[in-house]
Amino acid sequence: MNVSGKKIVVVIPAYKAALTLPGVLARIPADVHEQLFKILVVEDGGEKVPRSTDAELLAKYPKIEVLFHEHNRGYGAAQKTGYRRALELGADIAAMLHADGQYAPEELPRLLEPLVTGSADLVLGSRMRSWRSALRGGMPKYKFVANICLTQLENLAYGLRFSEYHSGYMLYSRRALTVVPFEKLSDTFHFDGEMLLVGAKKGLRVADLPIPTHYGDEESHLKPIKYGFEVLGVIRDYWRGKYDFPGE
């Protein structure tokens, strides 16, 4: 893969991920890794939680830069820290990976392509482009049904047509990170969906691309019922104008 001189940064929020993060880093394709400018690991656990990185890992992957939160601030907050630093570094593209390996690093070349060529501003890696693939990948049936129902409701409410709003495999151009006022979005698991919503409403070009689904024995910190009700809250807030951001 040729990144055409683009400065690409990978952002990885990490919380109690010492056992899984090394495997995620090892799965980044070699040709992509060689062309990465920086890998930003955001330690979101604070001092009381074991760190996901150690001296051995940092020596093996010298492109890693570790960013620390003094206490657990949340999934969205960790991304904000990463993207803020990516912009400071002059990144042209920021790609998000999960430290637990749920989203395949092997897909990075294909997902990066629309951003490298300039045909998209934001890339959504969607598990729901193929319902059969989602189920084969181990997505629990209750999550599968909830994803479909919530996504259809969101598309209806927002006047958009995306295959899902609940994937954590997101990639952004520098333009996307400057057009969307991401600092004003949620610090929680809703950050990704809000980025997608606000980006689309601001006219960003979104590539909705299929990715494989993987559910293994990784620990999830998302509470499904609470999350579902909070999605309804996001829809309510949208209709109240929370995501209009006039003049930005």
For each feature predicted by the language model, list its residue ranges.
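Hydrophobic helical membrane-anchoring modules
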Residues: 1-8, 159, 183-248
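Short beta-strand/loop segment that forms part of the nucleotide-sugar
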Residues: 36-46, 67-69
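Acceptor/aglycone-binding surface of glycosyltransferases and processive sugar-polymer synthases
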Residues: 71-88, 93, 105-189, 216-226, ...
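Short, well-formed alpha-helical segments that are part of the catalytic scaffolds
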Residues: 17-30
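A conserved acidic beta->alpha catalytic loop
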Residues: 43-53, 101
